[in-house]
Amino acid sequence: QDMFRLSGIHRDVYLVASPKVRLRDIHLTSQISDRLDKAELKVKTDVHNYGKKVQEATVRVSLLNTEGKPVSSFIIPTGKITGGQENVCEGTTTIRDPRLWSAETPSLYTVQLELLDAAGNVLEATSQQYGFRKIEIRNNKVYINNALILFKGANRHDIHPQFGKAVPVESMIEDILLFKRFNLNTIRTSHYPNDPKMYSLYDYYGLYVMDE
C-alpha cells in the first residue's frame, strides 16, 4: 500500500481508574421521522460490576441542544448486577424539530450519562456529542436528511512530515480546514482507521467519512 510503515507507540495510551460498578460501554442510535420533525434517541449502556457483591444502580441520561440547554432527561434502571457480570440497559427519548447534522450544518447535541448508586450518589459521569441525521439509499443514490448528496472527497493518511504517525491535533485541524477550503465534504481514511480524535473533529467541522 502507498504509505510509510513506522514502528512504536504513536497514539494515546492510558490507564482508566473507575469505580467497581461502571459504564463499560455506551451505544447511541436514532430514528428520524420521514418529515424530519421528530427524532428518537436510543441509549444502550453496558453496566459492569467489577466487585463481588450484587449491586443495583441507575443511569441518568440528559440531552443538551447545540447551545448546551437541556431538552430531555430520563432514567434507565440497571436492575441487580451480579458480581463479575454486567447488564445491558436501554432507554429512549423523543425530541421535536431536531437540528439535523450534515456536512453543511454540523449541529451536535451532547448526551450526558451519570451512573448513580442506590443512594443517588454519582459513581461515574461521561458525555458524548451526537449528530442526528437520516441516511438512506434510494435507487443507488445516497440521501442525507432527504437531500441527495454528491460526495466530493479525498484520501487521507494519518501521518505528519515531522512527527510521523504521532499526528498533533493542530495538524488534524489544519487538514480539515484545508479540505473545507477546497469545498470537499468527504474523507476516506485510507487504509486504516484514523486517530479517534479525528472522528470527533470530522463531526464538529462537518465531513462525511468513509472509514477503513
What are these regions (language model features)?
Residues Q1-P196, L201-V209:
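Secreted/periplasmic carbohydrate-active enzymes, especially glycoside hydrolases
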